C-alpha cells in the first residue's frame, strides 16, 4: 500500500511532457532556433524550417523515456506514402466526403496525403470544388494541400 501511495505521488508530481517543439523550447527556456530535435526515423536533426513546419502541421513529439524525437520533412513524406500504401480504405470525390462522413466539410479534420499538414478551409473547399479525391487512410481523411497540389496536378498531365 505504501509503495502504491509513493508511486502515485511521483506520478502526480511528474510534469506533463511537451507535445510540440515550441512547448519544449519554452520548457527549456531556449529560443526555438536553438532547439535541436532528431528525427525519429532517420536520426537527422531538424533544421529551423523543419522545426517550424513540424509545429505548423500540428504533429506530436515522440517521447521514449526522457529522449524526444520529431519527424523531418523527408520522413513525413515517406510516412505519408507508407500509410497510404498500407492502410488505404476508400476514396470519395469532392463534396461526396460530406455524404460519406455525415459531417460538413468545415467540421472535418483532413491532413495532406503527401506532407501531413492539416488542410485549411480554403484548401478543403478548393478540393471539393475541383472534384479532387479525399482518401480514407487509417480511419482518417487525407486530401491535398495548396503546397502539394502543384505536384499532384502536374503529375496528371
From Swiss-Prot:
Main localisation, per the record? host cell
Tell me which UniProt keywords the record has, alphabetically.
Activator, DNA-binding, Early protein, Host cytoplasm, Host nucleus, Host-virus interaction, Inhibition of host innate immune response by virus, Metal-binding, Modulation of host cell apoptosis by virus, Transcription, Transcription regulation, Viral immunoevasion, Zinc, Zinc-finger
Q: How does it assemble?
A: Forms homodimers. Interacts with ubiquitin-protein ligase UBE3A/E6-AP; this interaction stimulates UBE3A ubiquitin activity. Interacts with host BAK1.
Give a GO cellular-component term. Answer: host cell cytoplasm
Biological role stated in the UniProt entry: Plays a major role in the induction and maintenance of cellular transformation. E6 associates with host UBE3A/E6-AP ubiquitin-protein ligase and modulates its activity. Protects host keratinocytes from apoptosis by mediating the degradation of host BAK1. May also inhibit host immune response.
Q: Which family does it belong to?
A: Belongs to the papillomaviridae E6 protein family.
Q: What does the entry give for GO biological process?
A: DNA-templated transcription; regulation of DNA-templated transcription; symbiont-mediated perturbation of host apoptosis; symbiont-mediated perturbation of host ubiquitin-like protein modification; symbiont-mediated suppression of host innate immune response; symbiont-mediated suppression of host type I interferon-mediated signaling pathway
Please identify the protein, giving its name as recorded: Protein E6
Which domain of life, per UniProt?
A: Viruses
Specify one Pfam family. Answer: E6
Source organism: Human papillomavirus 12
User: Where do the ZnF regions (unnamed) fall?
Assistant: 39-75, 112-148
Amino acid at each position: 500500500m505504501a509503495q502504491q501511495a509513493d508511486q502515485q505521488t511521483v506520478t502526480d508530481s511528474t510534469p506533463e511532457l511537451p507535445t510540440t517543439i515550441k512547448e519544449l523550447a519554452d520548457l527549456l527556456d531556449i529560443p526555438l532556433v536553438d532547439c535541436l530535435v532528431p528525427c525519429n526515423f532517420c536520426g537527422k536533426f531538424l533544421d529551423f524550417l523543419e522545426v517550424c513546419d513540424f509545429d505548423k502541421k500540428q504533429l506530436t513529439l515522440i517521447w521514449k523515456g526522457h529522449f524526444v524525437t520529431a519527424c523531418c520533412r523527408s520522413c513525413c513524406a515517406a510516412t505519408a506514402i507508407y500509410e497510404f500504401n498500407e492502410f488505404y480504405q476508400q476514396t470519395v470525390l469532392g463534396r461526396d466526403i460530406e455524404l460519406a462522413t455525415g459531417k460538413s466539410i468545415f467540421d472535418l479534420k483532413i491532413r495532406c496525403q503527401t506532407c501531413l499538414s492539416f488542410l485549411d478551409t480554403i484548401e478543403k473547399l478548393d478540393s471539393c470544388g475541383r472534384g479532387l479525391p479525399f482518401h480514407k487512410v487509417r480511419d482518417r481523411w487525407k486530401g491535398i494541400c495548396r503546397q502539394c497540389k502543384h505536384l499532384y496536378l502536374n503529375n496528371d498531365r
